[in-house]
């Protein structure tokens, strides 16, 4: 039978690392959400200005 090894960390350093990585992760998520919103706003602007051209570009010809 295979033996399992258990590694146990001691001290509170892990909690500090976890808290800082969680804060950094939250900051990154907020930045990505902001960038995504900006991109979607830009797409909306293009569609408002050129909706007809946009649709024509994606209409398949020949009934395909």
Curated annotation (Swiss-Prot):
There is a cross-link at residue 64 (Isoglutamyl lysine isopeptide (Gln-Lys) (interchain with K-? in acceptor proteins)). Keywords: Coiled coil, Isopeptide bond, Ubl conjugation pathway. GO terms for molecular function: proteasome binding; protein tag activity. The keyword Coiled coil applies. It comes from the Bacteria. Pfam families: Pup. Residues 21-58 are annotated as: ARC ATPase binding. Residues 1-11 have a biased composition (Basic and acidic residues). Residues 1-37 are annotated as: Disordered. GO terms for biological process: modification-dependent protein catabolic process; proteasomal protein catabolic process; protein pupylation. Pathway: Protein degradation; proteasomal Pup-dependent pathway. InterPro entries: Ubiquitin-like_Pup. Is modified by deamidation of its C-terminal glutamine to glutamate by the deamidase Dop, a prerequisite to the subsequent pupylation process. The modification Deamidated glutamine is found at residue 64. Residues 24-52 form a coiled coil. The N-terminal unstructured half of Pup provides a signal required to initiate unfolding and degradation by the proteasome but is not needed for pupylation, while the C-terminal helical half of Pup interacts with ARC to target proteins to the proteasome. Strongly interacts with the proteasome-associated ATPase ARC through a hydrophobic interface; the interacting region of Pup lies in its C-terminal half. There is one Pup binding site per ARC hexamer ring. Protein modifier that is covalently attached to lysine residues of substrate proteins, thereby targeting them for proteasomal degradation. The tagging system is termed pupylation. Belongs to the prokaryotic ubiquitin-like protein family. This is Prokaryotic ubiquitin-like protein Pup. The gene is pup.
């Amino acid at each position: 039978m295979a033996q399992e090894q258990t590694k146990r960390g001691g001290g509170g350093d892990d909690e500090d690392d976890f808290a800082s990585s969680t804060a950094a992760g939250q900051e990154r998520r907020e930045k990505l959400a902001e960038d995504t919103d900006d991109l979607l706003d830009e797409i909306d602007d293009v569609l408002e200005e050129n909706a007809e051209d946009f649709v024509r570009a994606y209409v398949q010809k020949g009934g395909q």
